[in-house]
């Protein structure tokens, strides 16, 4: 199980990462990583970066089973 310091160190080494990448690299359940990142965001240590993918070739997000959530990526980086 990862600690807040290990999450911080991984972000420092990689620059920015998605929560699922952190979860896989640190071998920690994603709900725990999500909670740690939200806590670190509240402490002002990390920042959430939301990006909308422009690569949706069909432009039919309304009919996509995942909806627009599949086109939107959420990254985390140190502040």
Curated annotation (Swiss-Prot):
GO terms for molecular function: DNA binding; iron ion binding; iron-sulfur cluster binding. It comes from the Bacteria. Gene3D superfamilies: Winged helix-like DNA-binding domain superfamily/Winged helix DNA-binding domain (1.10.10.10). Pfam families: FeoC (PF09012). Iron-sulfur cluster binds at residues 56, 61, 64, 71. Transmembrane segments: none annotated. The keyword Zinc-finger does not apply. The keyword Iron-sulfur applies. Keywords: DNA-binding, Iron, Iron-sulfur, Metal-binding, Repressor, Transcription, Transcription regulation. HAMAP family: FeoC. May function as a transcriptional regulator that controls feoABC expression. Belongs to the FeoC family. This is Probable [Fe-S]-dependent transcriptional repressor. It comes from Klebsiella pneumoniae (strain 342). The lineage of its organism: Bacteria, Pseudomonadati, Pseudomonadota, Gammaproteobacteria, Enterobacterales.
